[in-house]
Amino acid sequence: MVRSGKKAVVLATVAFCATSVVQKTCGFVPSPLRQRAAAAGAAASVATMFAPAAFADEIGDAAKTLGDASYAFAKEVDWNNGIFLQAPGKLQPLAALKAIDKMIVMGAAADPQLLKAAAEAHHKAITTVSGANGVTSRADWDNVNAALGRVISAVPEKMVMDVYNSVAKITDPKVPAYMNSLVNGADAEKAYAGFLAFKDVVKKNQVTSAAGPATVPSGDTIGVAAQKLSDASYPFLKQIDWLSDVYLKPLPGVSAQQSLKAIDRMIVMGAQADGNALKAAAEAHHKAIGSIDAKGVTSAADYAEVNAAIGRVVASVPKSTVMDVYKAMASVTDTGIPLNMFSKVNPLDANAAAKAFYTFKDVVLAAQR
């Protein structure tokens, strides 16, 4: 059971991370080992509009069969457990970043419409979360699994296995056995067998090559403003301890369900964003990870590219959607958190960065649809 449990944990993580953009969550998603979340997607019925009927039906039908085998297990998992915020073993920030980078590469290669479908499926599933364990409905469980299966089938197998292998490297071998001890072992085995059958259907429909890179604007107002922001804020950036475990700490006084509602706003925003802009942002992050130093700080040039890419993503989303995210995060962020983070850097550099950010925000707002 330990061996198969490890595979189940890691493979389920691969599936979930296909639509994630590094966000911490304690609510429902179809994998017992979650770290962060955020994503892009739509209900399975919407996904079928962007794929051949046979393809959609085959993966959709397989997802229902997986649901038959796994929903009992899903109901036993305590999705509200704070353990999902923890590293799956020893804290290894730089090693974990390599695993996250593989997820980003995989996400960047995925079909934007299928990513959108997966995000919308997650959003819908969050609305039916109930019970003490915070599990979604059976129908939404199936829809999410189908949407994730379609996303994974749209990227080459090697990219999927790169994620699998990188996550396996940072997962303590004792984790699967411990997670298995929290549920009914027979149900876990049945879910794993169902997952393997589902995996075979996804693999049967998998593409052999990835799509080309995103189109990146040159000389646009957001790009120019991003360079100014980066010049003003890079000294501040270099002072941040990117290797700290503070980013894994739970928000004080915030329940799993409260956090999930805030994360849901991010998922909705991701689903509304322009697909090419999201792809470009993922590619910019991948490039930036490639230039980080021993302290986890990227180069000034890559920092500017990331800021520009994020600005373009935000500009592609309605202002009201962006503000929904802002307000949702403000509602779960204790006032002591900004003060604590502020105390760890030079206040003058932090203020200079904030001032530049507000200017950048205005440029993005002017370009917003």
Curated annotation (Swiss-Prot):
At which residues is there a site annotated Chlorophyll a binding? Answer: H122, H285
In the UniProt record, which is one GO cellular component term?
light-harvesting complex
Record carries keyword Repeat: yes
Q: Which UniProt keywords apply?
A: Chlorophyll, Chloroplast, Chromophore, Light-harvesting polypeptide, Plastid, Repeat, Transit peptide
**Where does the record say this protein resides?**
Plastid, Chloroplast
The sequence repeats lie at: 57-219, 220-369
Q: Name one GO molecular function term.
A: chlorophyll binding
Q: What transmembrane ranges does the database entry give?
A: none
InterPro entries linked to this entry:
Peridinin-chlorophyll-bd_prot, Peridinin-chlorophyll-bd_sf
Which SUPFAM superfamilies is this protein grouped with?
Peridinin-chlorophyll protein
Mark out the transit peptide: 1-56
**What function does the entry list?**
Water-soluble antenna for capture of solar energy in the blue-green range. Peridinin is an asymmetric carotenoid.
What free text does the record give on domains? The mature protein is composed of 2 almost identical repeat units.
Q: State whether it acts alone or in a complex, and with which partners, per the record.
A: Homotrimer.
The molecule here is called Peridinin-chlorophyll a-binding protein 2, chloroplastic
Originating species: Amphidinium carterae
